[in-house]
Amino acid sequence: MYQPDFPPVPFRLGLYPVVDSVQWIERLLDAGVRTLQLRIKDRRDEEVEADVVAAIALGRRYNARLFINDYWRLAIKHQAYGVHLGQEDLQATDLNAIRAAGLRLGVSTHDDMEIDVALAARPSYIALGHVFPTQTKQMPSAPQGLEQLARHVERLADYPTVAIGGVSLARAPAVIATGVGSIAVVSAITQAADWRLATAQLLEIAGVGDE
């Protein structure tokens, strides 16, 4: 049963781009995307604070679900919609502070054991990856493939789930067919020859998410 320890999110979050700049946040919100993540890696809080503030303000303006990757203190300070954490970040994060601030929490997983860890935290949603080989970040684990993804989605039947990792426009329909509630994309949009067209096509497949 879906009873998160954090505020709930819709079962279907729809198309969920993960981007590294405020410029991309603004572009995609303007293109109709309503679930996004700002993921800026390996910089100090004070270096990214202005970007976090700007992204959160844009999210509010468009009434969107904007998650901040990793920088949970800044997300709390500036009242983001939510925070996304990797497995390696869970232990070093004050989950009670995120909960007390009323922020949603998403957690990355790569196998059944990590799903167990995520479920113990009772987050708002669980990300399942990486589905296919990905160039976006170095991954110590092997790609799960569609069959494994479908098994995880079935296990988490009533939990909001997000598929991530190598999800392209061509692969997106098969990923959605597993029953997963959302697809997270990176290069499928940011490296597309025509990002507006790619975004529109992906929105047609994955939707904007439930209210």
Curated annotation (Swiss-Prot):
What's an example GO cellular component term for this entry? cytoplasm
Annotated residues for binding of 4-amino-2-methyl-5-(diphosphooxymethyl)pyrimidine: Q37, L38, R39, I40, K41, N69, S108, K137
Superkingdom, according to UniProt?
Bacteria
GO BP annotation list:
thiamine biosynthetic process; thiamine diphosphate biosynthetic process
UniProt enzyme class: transferase
Residues involved in 2-[(2R,5Z)-2-carboxy-4-methylthiazol-5(2H)-ylidene]ethyl phosphate binding: T134, Q135, T136, G166, V186, S187
Q: Which residues form a coiled coil?
A: none
- What keywords sit in the KW lines? Magnesium, Metal-binding, Thiamine biosynthesis, Transferase
The Swiss-Prot or TrEMBL record annotates one GO molecular function as: magnesium ion binding
A Pfam family recorded for this sequence: TMP-TENI
| CC cofactor | Mg(2+)
EC nos: 2.5.1.3
What function does the entry list? Condenses 4-methyl-5-(beta-hydroxyethyl)thiazole monophosphate (THZ-P) and 2-methyl-4-amino-5-hydroxymethyl pyrimidine pyrophosphate (HMP-PP) to form thiamine monophosphate (TMP).
Q: What is this protein called?
A: Thiamine-phosphate synthase
**Which source organism?**
Escherichia coli O9:H4 (strain HS)
